[in-house]
């Protein structure tokens, strides 16, 4: 670890795929409480800008921090990627503090699209922020557009909170020129922020929250000490369904269960977690997980690898102390309990955006202060991989699981999805057959539309057959190529339970690079949040799908795009009753 005079921390990580990865602690959307919710997320969207033909890049805003990364591709170099990312924050050697109203307006529209996307596909309910005075969704809404001047002032104010002590930088390689460049830019920031937030959010403990969830989860408040952080790292590397959350200066260990009986035993104090010592902790974490640790605990004064001897040599005492603290929090009701609930009728409170939820007090009724049993935890394996064809009965359940667990990777190709994970076969089956997970997986049917229409365009099956068998196997096979005949009609209007645009496009020079560039152009215009595309077996032919509330504008953009010499697009209007009748007459797919 290299520490600049203003406390910027720089790490060399030659194993990461990114060229540069930057995080800003104490800079997430928890800072929006008592201001306009969404300022942090809007700032993230305003800052990131790059040439998608030369770079891969992304950014994210969480409760307590913001992070950005950039990777060079094609003819660009690592140095180009570093300078590109730094340019998001600095202009002419000074920290950016000017945002045009037109750009703010476009990105607010994009935020509304992101809200729509996330609520169609996920359950984006942030319990901790809600209990701390925020909303269940804190990513920004379209009504921000009514206060553009106030929003711009808040954005400038937020930029002035950035300080050297907040900055963490990972680089793949660090030469003298790069280090000097960092000193001239992030190293020029003040060591302490010029503007300090007026309040640090504090959540309310002793609550039971009934909300959609794939698991029965208990958030246990523990002290944010070094030993407890090392204990969390130990548990995370060894077991599944254990993680942590932070808000303000508070730390919670999150423990999830698939068995309601075990969950209730843990809550009543009659059972403790069965934590056993493993052979060795290697700290072989992803760069995302490492960055999150440094940002959530900015007071860490050493490289995490400096603690590898301590976490292994002192693991017994660390885990005993952590186990005792967990049990004390259970007894004292320093917990937040999440109980899976999928009823739209049950509600006893709402946030300012009128999202309904049930919040109850966690009482001491039935509490047992002497545990007499232990609960086994799911152990991690080194690696596992499965391939699932489109239309397989387990497809959507596996996608749901990958979306709910950050350590599951999913890659899509023309025939199906390849999933990498570290579960045993028995554990993954137990999860996917559990009552709460099955309800959660089926509670957001919108994600299915992407695969329904991919099946329609790529398999040659009729829309009636696909809809009649949407939960069973629809074979994709390389043995037969679907010859797609593009007719005169380029638009087919349907009614579904989500608003989206999808279809197939063909172009002589069409490739993934041009489609990524197109996606970013649509994002800059505020018309979409993201666009998925799959390369079909027919030459230069792609399937596109995007959730959007601006369906006509997106259709017009795609319909007039000169990269496509043939297209067949489906435009869905949201409604209570599905109607795909327009697809039965004119769309011809010859196998």
Swiss-Prot record:
Cofactors, names only: Zn(2+)
Gene Ontology molecular functions: metalloendopeptidase activity; zinc ion binding
Induction field: Expressed in the late phase of the viral replicative cycle.
Keywords noted in UniProt: Hydrolase, Late protein, Metal-binding, Metalloprotease, Protease, Virion, Zinc
Region forming the signal peptide: none
Gene Ontology BP terms: proteolysis; viral life cycle
Free-text comment on the cofactor: Binds 1 zinc ion.
Effect of substituting residue 45 to A: Complete loss of processing activity
Record-annotated membrane-spanning stretches: none
Subcellular location: Virion
Enzyme class: hydrolase
PTM (free text): Undergoes proteolytic processing during the course of infection. May be cleaved into 46 kDa and 22 kDa products (Potential).
Result, substituting residue 112 to A: Complete loss of processing activity
EC number(s) per entry: 3.4.24.-
Effect noted on mutating residue 44 to A: Complete loss of processing activity
Family membership noted in the UniProt record: Belongs to the peptidase M44 family.
Function field: Probably involved in maturation of some viral proteins by processing them preferentially at Ala-Gly-|-Ser/Thr/Lys motifs. Does not seem to be responsible for the cleavage of major core proteins.
Name of this chain's protein: Metalloendopeptidase OPG085
Protein source organism: Vaccinia virus (strain Western Reserve)
């Amino acid at each position: 670890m290299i520490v600049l005079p203003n406390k910027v921390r720089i790490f060399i990580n030659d194993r990461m795929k990114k060229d540069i990865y930057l995080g800003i602690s104490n800079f997430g959307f928890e800072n929006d409480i008592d201001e306009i919710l969404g300022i942090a997320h809007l700032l993230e969207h305003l800052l990131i800008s790059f040439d998608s033909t030369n770079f891969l890049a992304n950014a994210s805003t969480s409760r307590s921090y913001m992070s950005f990364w950039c990777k060079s591709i094609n003819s660009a170099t690592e140095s180009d990627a570093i300078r590109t990312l730094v340019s998001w924050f600095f202009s002419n050697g000074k920290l950016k503090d000017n945002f045009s109203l037109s750009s703010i307006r476009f990105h607010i529209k994009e935020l509304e699209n992101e809200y729509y996307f996330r609520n169609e596909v996920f359950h984006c309910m942030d319990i901790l922020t809600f209990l701390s005075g925020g909303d269940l969704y804190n990513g920004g809404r379209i009504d921000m557009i009514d206060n553009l001047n106030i929003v711009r002032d808040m954005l400038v104010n937020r930029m002035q909170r950035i300080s050297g002590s907040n900055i963490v930088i990972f680089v793949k390689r660090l030469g003298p020129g790069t280090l000097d460049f960092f000193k001239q830019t992030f190293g020029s920031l003040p060591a302490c922020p010029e503007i300090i937030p007026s309040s640090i959010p504090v959540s309310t403990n002793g609550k039971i929250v009934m909300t959609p969830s794939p698991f029965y989860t208990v958030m246990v408040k523990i002290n944010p000490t070094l030993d407890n952080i090392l204990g969390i790292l130990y548990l995370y590397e060894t077991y599944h369904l254990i993680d942590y959350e932070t808000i303000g200066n508070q730390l919670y260990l999150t423990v999830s269960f698939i068995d309601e009986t075990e969950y209730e035993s843990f809550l009543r104090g009659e059972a403790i977690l069965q934590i056993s010592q493993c052979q060795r902790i290697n700290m072989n974490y992803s760069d995302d997980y490492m960055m999150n640790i440094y940002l959530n605990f900015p007071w860490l004064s050493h490289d995490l690898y400096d603690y590898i001897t301590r976490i292994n040599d002192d693991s017994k005492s660390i885990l005993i102390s952590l186990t005792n603290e967990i049990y004390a929090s259970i007894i004292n009701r320093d917990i937040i309990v999440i109980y899976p609930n999928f009823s739209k009728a049950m509600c006893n409170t709402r946030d300012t955006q009128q999202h309904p939820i049930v919040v109850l007090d966690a009482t001491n009724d039935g509490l047992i202060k002497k545990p007499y049993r232990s609960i086994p935890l799911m152990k991690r394996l080194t690696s596992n991989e499965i391939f699932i064809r489109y239309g397989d009965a387990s497809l959507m359940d596996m996608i749901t699981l990958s979306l709910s667990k950050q350590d599951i990777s999913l890659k899509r190709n023309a025939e199906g999805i390849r999933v990498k994970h570290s579960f045993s076969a028995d554990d993954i089956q137990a999860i996917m057959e559990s009552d709460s997970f099955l309800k959660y997986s089926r509670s957001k049917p919108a994600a299915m539309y992407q695969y329904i229409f991919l099946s329609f365009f790529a398999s040659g099956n009729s829309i009636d057959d696909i809809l009649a068998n949407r939960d069973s196997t629809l074979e994709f096979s390389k043995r037969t190529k679907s010859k797609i005949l593009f007719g005169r009609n380029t638009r087919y209007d349907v009614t579904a339970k989500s608003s989206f645009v999808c279809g197939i496009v063909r172009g002589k020079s069409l490739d993934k690079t041009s489609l990524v560039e197109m996606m970013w152009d649509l994002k800059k215009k505020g018309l979409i949040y993201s666009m998925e595309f799959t390369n079909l077996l027919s030459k230069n032919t792609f399937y596109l799908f995007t959730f959007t509330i601006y369906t006509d504008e997106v259709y017009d953009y795609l319909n007039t795009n000169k990269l496509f010499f043939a297209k067949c697009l489906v435009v869905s209007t949201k409604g209570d009753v599905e109607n795909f009748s327009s697809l039965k007459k004119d769309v011809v797919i010859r196998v």
